[in-house]
Design a protein with these regions (language model features):
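Phosphate- and other anionic-substrate recognition elements at nucleic-acid/protein interfaces
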Residues: 1-165
Length: 165
């Protein structure tokens, strides 16, 4: 199974593609879709859409996983993140890729055993679990963690498996 993990952000959307075959899990590719603060909102969203579609075409994932919505203190920040998240979901849906979502605490717990783990702890565990030689950038590491969370959430009992959004 190939999973595309996406850590949605307007300025630095992390992406990570992970393969799980015959009990072995490997990182296929990871990185980020970067937008500087000089790029307007609509152009940022266009770049995120194009970047996600390009990764889907190149890596052919079976599905995508993203983090569930969290509440920011600033309403404007929440709205912008929601717009970026909508673009990501639409790009996946248009490409025929089902999308699954996980709460941030569940992602951390799935990787480290603790839902209160620090981001640095998550990235270190990602390195161990995927055999990476270098620590991925924060957004890319988060995306790999989100992909691994989906793989760790599968059950042999179909009724217990997560449902796409």
């Amino acid at each position: 199974m190939r999973v595309l993990g996406i850590d949605t952000s307007l300025r630095s959307t992390g992406v990570g593609v992970v393969d799980s075959l015959a009990g072995k899990t490997v990182a296929v590719e990871y990185g980020r879709i970067h937008n500087t603060d000089r790029v307007c909102l609509s152009e940022c969203l266009r770049r995120i859409d194009g970047g996600i579609r390009e990764i889907i075409l190149r890596t052919k994932p079976d599905l995508a996983s993203i983090e569930d919505i969290f509440f920011a203190k600033n309403a404007h920040t929440s709205m912008v993140l929601g717009e970026a998240r909508g673009v990501v979901i639409a790009a996946c849906a248009t490409s025929g890729i089902p999308v699954y979502q996980y709460e941030p605490r569940r992602v951390k717990q799935s990787i480290t055993g603790s839902g209160a783990a620090e981001k640095a702890q998550v990235r270190k565990m990602i390195m161990v679990l995927l055999g990476l030689k270098e620590e991925p950038q924060e957004d890319a590491g988060d995306a790999l963690a989100i992909a691994l969370c989906h793989l760790n959430s599968r059950s042999p009992v179909p009724e217990l498996n997560p449902k796409p959004i």
